């Protein structure tokens, strides 16, 4: 006979516990689940006493401090307070399983979606927490409903909220593949063909030929005039998987979208994510975001409709200041020979049965080198299987993860060595456009820093976890070290970078020249893996000096105004959108390129009420930033001339951009890395422009700046010009220069003569891996070829020239010395023809 113990407690009703700390004591936990950690208890207590009535709250805990349990306890507390239903959202299905396992371990009741069922009744009745993944909630055909047809929720919690926000943006985006959706791709391509030719004929030809890296933005005025045709094309194909889930969100909001076209896909994405379309989230009584301590949360202001106050004032445990052990190693600082290729080659050769090694790379292209060396390359379909293999102890080969910096946990032996390979790459065309247009933007650089920090954190998942992190790739090293961008990292990461620089210097001092530099790098890793007491004490003492001295930023206010302006525009309140954007420009923007970016938004807001005024504003935007949309009329080419110029003073002016020699050297290393075959055209041409300025020439990119003319144009003393046509993306196995490429070169030579006259002195170069001109092709002018070896020779001489500058301050660097160094390294204008180029060979039939 079962005894009714509750009856013995007289007639009192036992109210469920609402204090999450007390609640934890009542749970039927498994024996492996011990007491709450101090950090968990501190955060839970503070939430219960001070924050539990707030609508919006960000909770920040160190990795490994148990934020999953904290989140589950908060939701159970709210359920016990009759403030359900409560929803726990993970960034992917893989992490749903992990959270469910945690809930089982701690005895917290939960429910999940069955394969074919609707929303569980246990969730709707406020009985159990519903654990699901972000794609299930945020899509145009969400089971939770959209707009006014949403399912009521009491509390929504986003776990790993930074990973979730990217997925939410993708929910509003249609991405149409050229290969799998050729019909829709072709129709949209044809629809905007004439408009895109006006924006840049060369780029449009590259897109038509299927170039992956080239992309263009459809002008907002063309999008507006042809939106009905776009809707017809999309509506007819709405059942296609690439359109199906986003279509309900787009179909009545098409004017608030922008279209980007590349050689491989078309992307239609919103200027601003309308999170209010998902009422289950936007109308929830409480919205809780879980975030790591190293992450910058400012983007929640625009992306999730949070107030700046909520973002600036998270709930966090102030002690300890840091968690886990990260040995950051920058091999190129140990020795120049420890470059990207050497590290990849050496570490792909290493075989170990004791721990896992991971490489995080930014693109599919970056995977190829690892693949050729026998590494395991993960795909979207295989990634979690490969991660499980690592956790089971299968450490046979290095595992490569492509462009995924979040939502991955690799604790303990599953990852003891992490290679962070090259600067993260934005996959979305909208993000790539903003990065290209505003490379110095605080917003863009914060997002890049955030991706890097997410990557760094993959291998250290707890207080006692440790991992060696190798940082390779000149652009990435520069971003992490440079004064201009290092400030965008958290205090924790900045300190770890400082430690990395210091141990590289220590290694240099103890470096035995008979030893291979890469062995020095490996010996550093061994010290950490073998738990060297000196290293552990040094790391701990350095990290304990950590001070969070972040300065106040205007980024919150800027993101708020961006969001408000877009909301006004989408509601048809054009005047308020215009005044909000004008205020943002006047009060918060200093940099001219960024001012141009915001002027373009202002021109777009003005377009519905005054086309003429919109064109004038777009002209102003384009003059400040030539990476933006070319206005429909009124842009003239500005010729370059060396009159009143002094080459040596120009070189000094270039050097003055940098606060010290180290900053200059970092910048030049990154530029020279981009001046390589295989680099995407935009980066290569930008690097060549920078090299022209470094060498004291007037340097221009006509094709980018006015959509006509050569890729690069330099002007030197006595108005001697160097004209460059760049083909950095041409395969190195290509046997000949095509008739089309020769014709393109001829057109650009003709443009130059039209602008500068037939008597202008100029050398004309094509940078391409082959010197053989197709029999069908012909050049109308004398053209010289720069191939790999000549390009490498030029880069070596530039690097040598910059190294020679190290002992000098600007004041000490005389004209004579500077001129001698330029001559020594063959960097005068006549050297380009004589030293770094060769004649082409015209193939016979």
Enumerate the language-model features and the residues they cover:
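SF2 helicase motor core recognition
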Residues: 68, 138-151, 159, 164, ...
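Conserved RecA-like P-loop NTPase helicase motor core
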Residues: 389-478, 730-731, 765, 769
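Conserved pre-motif I regulatory segment
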Residues: 2-60
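Inter-Walker segment of RecA-like/P-loop motor cores
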Residues: 97-98, 103-148, 385-390
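Conserved Walker A/P-loop ATP-binding site and its immediately adjacent core
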Residues: 65-114, 136-139, 294-299, 360-367
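Conserved coupling segment at the C-terminus of the helicase ATP-binding
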Residues: 56-58, 62, 152-155, 160-339, ...
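Interdomain/boundary linker segments immediately adjacent to catalytic/signaling cores
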Residues: 618-621, 625-679
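Catalytic core segments in nucleotide and nucleic-acid processing enzymes
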Residues: 364-367, 383-389, 394, 422, ...
């Amino acid at each position: 006979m079962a005894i009714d113990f509750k009856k013995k407690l007289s007639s009192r009703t036992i109210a469920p516990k609402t204090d999450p700390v007390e609640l934890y004591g009542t749970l039927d936990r498994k024996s492996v689940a011990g007491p709450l950690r101090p950090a968990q208890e501190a955060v839970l207590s503070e939430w219960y006493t001070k924050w539990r009535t707030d609508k919006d709250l960000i909770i920040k805990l160190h990795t490994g401090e148990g934020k999953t349990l904290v989140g589950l306890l908060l939701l159970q507390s709210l359920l016990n307070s009759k403030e359900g239903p409560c929803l726990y959202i993970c960034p992917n299905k893989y992490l749903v399983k992990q959270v469910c396992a945690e809930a089982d371990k701690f005895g917290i009741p939960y429910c999940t979606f069955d394969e074919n069922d609707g929303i569980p009744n246990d969730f709707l009745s406020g009985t159990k927490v519903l654990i699901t993944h972000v794609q299930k909630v945020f899509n145009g055909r969400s089971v939770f409903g959209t707009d006014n047809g949403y399912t009521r929720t009491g509390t929504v919690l986003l776990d790993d909220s930074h990973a979730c926000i990217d997925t939410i943006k993708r929910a509003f985006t249609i991405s149409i593949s050229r290969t799998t959706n050729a019909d829709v791709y072709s129709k949209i391509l044809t629809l905007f063909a004439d408009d895109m030719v006006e924006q840049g004929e060369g780029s449009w030809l590259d897109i038509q030929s299927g170039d992956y890296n080239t992309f263009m933005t459809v002008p907002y005025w063309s999008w507006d005039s042809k939106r009905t045709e776009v809707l017809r094309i999309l509506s007819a194909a709405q059942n296609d998987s690439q359109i199906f889930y986003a279509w309900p969100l787009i179909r009545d909001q098409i004017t608030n979208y922008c279209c980007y076209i590349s050689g491989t896909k078309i992307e239609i994405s919103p200027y601003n994510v309308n999170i209010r379309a998902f009422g289950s989230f936007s109308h929830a009584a409480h919205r809780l975001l879980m975030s790591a301590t190293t992450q910058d949360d400012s983007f929640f202001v625009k992306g999730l409709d949070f107030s700046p106050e909520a973002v600036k004032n998270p709930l966090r445990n102030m002690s300890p200041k840091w968690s886990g052990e990260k040995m950051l190693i920058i091999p190129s600082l140990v020795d120049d020979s420890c470059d990207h290729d050497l590290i990849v080659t050496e570490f792909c050769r290493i075989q170990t049965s004791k721990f896992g090694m991971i490489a995080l790379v930014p693109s599919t292209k970056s995977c190829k080198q690892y693949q050729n060396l026998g590494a395991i390359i993960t795909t979207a379909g295989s990634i979690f299987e490969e991660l499980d293999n690592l956790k089971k102890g299968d450490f046979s080969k290095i595992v490569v993860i492509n462009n995924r910096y979040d939502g991955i946990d690799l604790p303990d032996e599953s990852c003891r060595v992490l290679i962070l390979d090259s600067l993260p790459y934005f996959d979305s065309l909208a993000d790539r456009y903003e990065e290209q247009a505003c490379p110095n933007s605080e917003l863009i650089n914060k997002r890049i820093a955030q991706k890097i920090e997410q990557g760094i954190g993959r291998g250290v998942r707890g207080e006692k976890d440790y991992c060696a992190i190798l940082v390779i790739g000149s652009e990435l090293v520069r971003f992490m070290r440079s004064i201009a961008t290092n400030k965008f990292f958290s205090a924790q990461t900045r300190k770890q970078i400082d430690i990395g620089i210091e141990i590289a210097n220590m290694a240099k001092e103890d470096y035995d020249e008979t030893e291979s530099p890469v062995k020095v790098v490996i010996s550093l890793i061994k010290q950490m893996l073998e738990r060297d007491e000196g290293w552990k004490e040094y790391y701990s003492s350095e990290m304990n000096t950590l001070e969070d001295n972040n300065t106040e930023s205007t980024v919150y206010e800027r993101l708020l105004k961006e969001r408000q302006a877009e909301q006004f525009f989408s509601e048809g309140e054009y005047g308020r959108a215009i005044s909000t954007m004008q205020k943002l420009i006047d009060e918060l923007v200093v940099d001219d390129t960024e001012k141009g970016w915001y002027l373009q938004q202002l021109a777009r807001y003005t377009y519905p009420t005054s086309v003429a005024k919109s064109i004038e504003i777009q002209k102003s935007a384009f003059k400040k930033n030539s990476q933006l949309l070319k206005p429909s009329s009124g842009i003239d080419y500005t010729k370059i001339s060396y009159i009143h110029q002094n080459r040596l003073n120009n070189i000094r002016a270039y050097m003055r951009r940098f606060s010290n020699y180290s900053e200059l050297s970092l910048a030049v290393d990154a530029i020279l890395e981009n001046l390589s075959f295989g680099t995407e055209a935009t980066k290569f041409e930008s690097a060549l422009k920078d090299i022209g300025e470094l060498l004291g020439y007037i340097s221009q990119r006509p094709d980018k700046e006015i959509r006509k003319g050569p890729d690069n144009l330099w002007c030197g003393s006595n108005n001697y010009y160097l004209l460059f046509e760049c083909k950095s993306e041409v395969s190195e196995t290509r046997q000949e220069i095509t008739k089309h490429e020769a014709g393109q070169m001829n057109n650009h030579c003709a443009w130059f003569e039209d602008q500068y006259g037939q008597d202008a002195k100029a050398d004309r170069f094509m940078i391409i891996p082959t010197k053989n001109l197709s029999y069908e092709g012909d050049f109308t002018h004398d053209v010289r070829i720069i191939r790999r070896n000549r390009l490498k020779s030029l880069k070596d001489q530039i690097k040598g020239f910059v190294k020679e500058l190290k002992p000098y301050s600007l004041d000490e660097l005389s004209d004579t010395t500077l001129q001698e160094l330029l001559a020594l390294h063959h960097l005068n204008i006549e050297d380009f023809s004589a030293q770094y180029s060769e004649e082409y060979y015209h193939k016979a039939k």
